Amino acid sequence: MPFVELDTNLPPQQVPQDLAEKLCSATATILSKPRERVNVTVRTGVSMVVGGSCAPCTQLLVSSIGVVGTAEQNKEHSAKFFQFLTENMGLEQDRILLRFVPLEPWQVGKKATVMTFL
């Protein structure tokens, strides 16, 4: 069950209206997870500084159980997420940051329990 959070200082009118939907589909493909298990949040107009500059930028946080735990996995994921973000947001790679956070099943709650017991 991947959780993807995208923060950007771009105003809403400069972000494609369907970005959340596209990011959901891209995440499902990149992480080899069913689309219906992917959770996406997009926040626009956020006050942000990346690399000492408040020029247009974005940060993407990807957390998931089992698929973001190694450098090798994340290197592959990073290349694909960077391609998606540069193509869909019009940002240069030096204005994009990614963070990968591996989760354990006991850290994700669903249906009044945690994933360990589902």
From Swiss-Prot:
SUPFAM superfamilies: Tautomerase/MIF. The modification N-acetylproline is found at P2. It comes from the Eukaryota. GO terms for molecular function: D-dopachrome decarboxylase activity. InterPro entries: Macrophage_inhib_fac (IPR001398), Tautomerase/MIF_sf (IPR014347). The keyword Nucleotide-binding does not apply. Its EC number is 4.1.1.84. Keywords: Acetylation, Cytoplasm, Lyase, Melanin biosynthesis. One of its GO terms (biological process) is melanin biosynthetic process. It is found in: Cytoplasm. It catalyses: D-dopachrome + H(+) = 5,6-dihydroxyindole + CO2. The keyword tRNA-binding does not apply. Transmembrane segments: none annotated. GO terms for cellular component: cytoplasm. Gene3D superfamilies: Macrophage Migration Inhibitory Factor. Homotrimer. Belongs to the MIF family. Tautomerization of D-dopachrome with decarboxylation to give 5,6-dihydroxyindole (DHI). This is D-dopachrome decarboxylase. It comes from Xenopus tropicalis (Western clawed frog).
